[in-house]
Amino acid sequence: IRRQREAAARIEAAFVDTARTIHNVEKNLLTNPTETVEQASRLVGQIVDSFLTAPDLALHVMSDKIGSEEMYFHSLNVTMLSLMVARDLKLPGEVVQCLGMGALFHDVGCRKVPDKIRLKTEPWTQAERNFYELHCEYGAEIGRELKFAPLALDVIEQHHEMFDGSGYPRQLRGEAIPLSARIFAVADVFDALSSRRPYKEPLPFDKVMAILHEGRGSHFDPSVLDTFTRLAPTLYAQLQGLDEASTRALLTDMVQRHFDVLV
C-alpha cells in the first residue's frame, strides 16, 4: 500500500514539476533554442510514456489545477488533453509525439504580439484582433527556424482553423485541416473555458461541454469532439464533492488499476 501511495504522489508531483519545466522551456526557447527544443521533446516523451498510461489519473490531477492563475499550466493541460484523444484514436507514435510538441508550443507566436493586446481585458478593436491572429503565422515561422517537424507545425499554424472554414489563418475546411490541429482545437477551447483568466471565472464542466457541442460541425470536427466527450466527463462526475482523503483514496485506486505491477 505504501508503494501505491508513493506512486500516486509521484504522479501528482510530476504534473506540477512538468508545468514548471514548461515555464522554463518557453522562457529559454529563443535564447537557447537547440537545447530547449531537445528538452521539450524529452518532456513530451515523458508525458506520453508516463501520464497516458493512466489517463483517468492524469485527467484528475490536471483538473485539480484548472483555474490556476499560473498560465503556463495551460500549455500542459492542452498537451495532455490532446494526447489523450490521440491515444484513444490509436494514432502512430510519431504523430502523437509531434502533436505533443505542437500543443506544447501552440502559442509560441504570441511572444511577437504586444502585451497591451495580448493581455487586454476589454474587447479588441478590429485592428488589434487582426494583429493577434498573426500569432499562428508567427509561431509557424519560429517553429520552422527551430526545425520543428511538419506535423508539429500543423498544430502551431492551424490550431485556430474551424471545421466549417470560418477560422484563421487560411480558412481551411473539414479534413483539409490536419487531424492534429482538429484534435488540439477541442482541447484548447475546453481548457480556455475551464480556466480562470484575468477577465473571467472558470465555467462549470457541464456548461463547458454544452458550449463545445454548440460548435459541433462548425467549430469542431464532430468525430473528434465525440471522442473527447466520451473521455472527459466520467472522472469529473466522480470527483464532485470529494474531500482530500477521498480524493487520495481515488488516486490510489487509479494507480492500482492502471499500474498492474503495483497491485
Predicted features, each with a name:
Residues I1-A13:
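Extended, charge-enriched "interface" segments that sit outside catalytic cores
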Residues R10-V263:
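Histidine- and acidic-residue-rich, metal-dependent catalytic cores
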